[in-house]
Amino acid sequence: MAVNDPLGDMLTRIRNAQMRRKGKVQTPGSRLRAHVLDVLQEEGYIRGYSTTEYGNGRSEFEIELKYFDGLPVIREIQRVSKPGRRVYTAVNAIPRVANGLGISIISTPKGVMADHAAREANVGGEVLCKVF
């Protein structure tokens, strides 16, 4: 089945797996998904991920989810910019998530990064998702 929003699909798989207290979840691979997973790993929301390459140019990620005292580290993960409604922001209007306790993941001309890194680099871009 074709997926119209691959990033939204990955975020939903993570959300559903954490509700079921799964240790790992698989999702099809792409460069954008890899960059978002890199940010989630750097910020401490997931343990890590591994890539499995298939011969026909396809790949799959296995994401290791993170828990603290039996509860998911990711309390909320939500897609902001969607295929039907893109959301862009300037550097001075980058939204704060949960009063600075969460992060926004932003696709900028300098790459995919967390909101605080985008402010430091003085770049805006497309707000992909927010994590708390």
From Swiss-Prot:
Keyword Cytoplasm: no
Disulfides per UniProt: none
Sorted UniProt keywords: Ribonucleoprotein, Ribosomal protein, RNA-binding, rRNA-binding
InterPro entries to which the protein is assigned, alphabetical: Ribosomal_uS8, Ribosomal_uS8_CS, Ribosomal_uS8_sf
SUPFAM superfamilies xrefs: Ribosomal protein S8
One BP annotation, GO: translation
One Gene Ontology molecular-function label: structural constituent of ribosome
Single GO cellular component term: ribosome
Sequence similarity: Belongs to the universal ribosomal protein uS8 family.
Free-text function comment from the UniProt entry: One of the primary rRNA binding proteins, it binds directly to 16S rRNA central domain where it helps coordinate assembly of the platform of the 30S subunit.
Assembly description: Part of the 30S ribosomal subunit. Contacts proteins S5 and S12.
Protein name per UniProt: Small ribosomal subunit protein uS8
Higher taxonomy: Bacteria, Pseudomonadati, Pseudomonadota, Alphaproteobacteria, Hyphomicrobiales
